[in-house]
Curated annotation (Swiss-Prot):
SUPFAM superfamilies, alphabetized: Glutathione synthetase ATP-binding domain-like (SSF56059), Succinyl-CoA synthetase domains (SSF52210)
Organism phylogeny: Bacteria, Pseudomonadati, Pseudomonadota, Gammaproteobacteria, Vibrionales
GO biological process: succinyl-CoA metabolic process; tricarboxylic acid cycle
First and last residue of the signal peptide: none
Superkingdom: Bacteria
Amino-acid positions noted as binding substrate in the UniProt annotation, renumbered to this chain: 264, 321-323
Cofactor: binding comment: Binds 1 Mg(2+) ion per subunit.
Cofactor requirements of the protein: Mg(2+)
Record field: transmembrane: none
Binding residues for ATP: 46, 53-55, 99, 102, 107
Stated name of the protein: Succinate--CoA ligase [ADP-forming] subunit beta
Keyword Zinc in annotation: no
Amino acid sequence: MNLHEYQAKQLFAEFGLPVPEGFACDTAQEAFEAAGRISTAKKVVKCQVHAGGRGKAGGVELHDTKEGVKEFAQKWLGKNLVTYQTDANGQPVTKILVEEASNIANELYLGAVVDRATRKIVFMASTEGGVDIEKIAEETPELIHQSAIDPLVGPQAYQGRELAFKLGLVGDQIKQFVKIFMGLGQMFSQYDLALLEINPLVITGEGNLLCLDGKINIDSNAMYRQPKLREMHDPSQEDEREAHAAQWELNYVALDGNVGCMVNGAGLAMGTMDIVNLHGGKPANFLDVGGGATKERVAEAFKIILSDDNVKAVLVNIFGGIVRCDMIAEGIIGAVKEVGVTVPVVVRLEGTNADLGREVLANSDVDIIAAVSLTDAAQKVVAAAEAK
């Protein structure tokens, strides 16, 4: 689960990190009033969306007057912001962050991720702040400095000092950086984060450090024990189909093809998408129904897939392990009838009672195309999609 910038900064402040004074606003009038409460002559106004590249897309501006701030809010609230990280529709803007402008002398980068290979939290710091860190990692990896935190021990001050020295910080800046490092390390573990970034972490004209932007991603598997963070969830930033899938514990990712895919198991789902591509088709989605391919879950999966108008055919690829293929076949038939599927449906069953499952499909009164192999299924669904 992602957080907005203003939410990330709220957490930063909770752990004693320096952040600009700012207010998240729902209306243009609130933005106008917030601008009046900020002491600096210039105010920064930012659209709050779960995407980068806001500045280049016009979603971040600097204003001298309260009226300018209000006009910005009127322009964007209720609209969609399209950036290089969004699709063509963009992300809806429901909040505007109004905050004090900062006197920036230099920009740094500070971030942290979980390194699954070492089972540690790895902090990354660079003097190249304010730019795409992936580009820096590819072109000049020597400019990125790392420090690994053992989650059983927690962040240590000496690790923060080492990074501060590598960043060229001096004097009181080192103490400030260590405080930021320690706070982020504690936050990462306490809130079950998967990723955090401060980009940029700026050095102000007065020589102080300031968290100018913030990005936080929380491990969705840990949300059950993070009630505070659950309340920060903004469903408006999610694809409607993906949100629907999450309610049914279905793993769904929308793509831009015309062949809907319903599979049990992430690995099999990826293999299915590959073979559809191999035979000239384009998958419309990744959808893993998991181990419990019940009639109800299959029906919801069909609803999600068919809510995409680009879908011209659906491939159901199920491997029956614990769940028998004949039971899965009955569930598919019931789901097709319930949903009223109008596009061709190709079904490939393999595993426990696969022959019986195919017999159930063949004897049903619904129009389902049975496949005897994965290659056969891919060829049939691609042909069906092209014929529509």
